[in-house]
Amino acid sequence: MESLRQKVKEDGVVIDEKILKVDGFLNHQIDAKLMHEVGKTFYEQFKDKGVTKILTIEASGIAPAIMASLHFDVPCLFAKKAKPSTLKDGFYSTDIHSFTKNKTSTVIVSEEFLNENDTVLIIDDFLANGDASLGLYDIAQQAKAKTVGIGIVVEKSFQDGRQRLEEAGLNVSSLCKVASLKGNQVTLLGENE
């Protein structure tokens, strides 16, 4: 997705050799037009898979996931990082470690909104070590839902997330693949690395 690749190159800020800040269009301020295009691209890639639900995790996964759900015309469900007082009945839960925040959170999804009749597309903002996507996949498995793929907005290809997801048998689609953040510069896969 060329517009996303260009945005990452122009507006992405390298924090260190493993962390890329994209607060200007994805993780804090959201470029709605770009996210609409992201959602449409995921729709084009997975439209024949019978998706009934988009699954993501709060907070940064919500923007691309909600845009995809508009194109699929299905609900967007996000895993919560805290159990709300309104959730009285059953829920699925799993522990997810955030690479960027270096923090482990227990995330939950109400059993009311995910079950064996669902066909799920998982969408997330970043792929680093794969923990968030694998955690969401675990929740889908607990619900006995079918997972048809993982849609990633920005993949850090120099980390092992894709490999871990593919080893789990998951179909991974990344719209922008970062090859390196060395030298305080964003190098995308396919560029002069």
Swiss-Prot record:
GO molecular function: xanthine phosphoribosyltransferase activity
Keywords: Cytoplasm, Glycosyltransferase, Purine salvage, Transferase
Listed pathway(s): Purine metabolism; XMP biosynthesis via salvage pathway; XMP from xanthine: step 1/1
GO biological process: purine ribonucleoside salvage; xanthine metabolic process; XMP salvage
Catalytic activity, EC: 2.4.2.22
Swiss-Prot/TrEMBL catalytic activity: XMP + diphosphate = xanthine + 5-phospho-alpha-D-ribose 1-diphosphate
Superkingdom, natural source: Bacteria
Subunit structure: Homodimer.
Designated name of the protein: Xanthine phosphoribosyltransferase
Source organism of the structure: Staphylococcus haemolyticus (strain JCSC1435)
Gene from which the chain derives: xpt
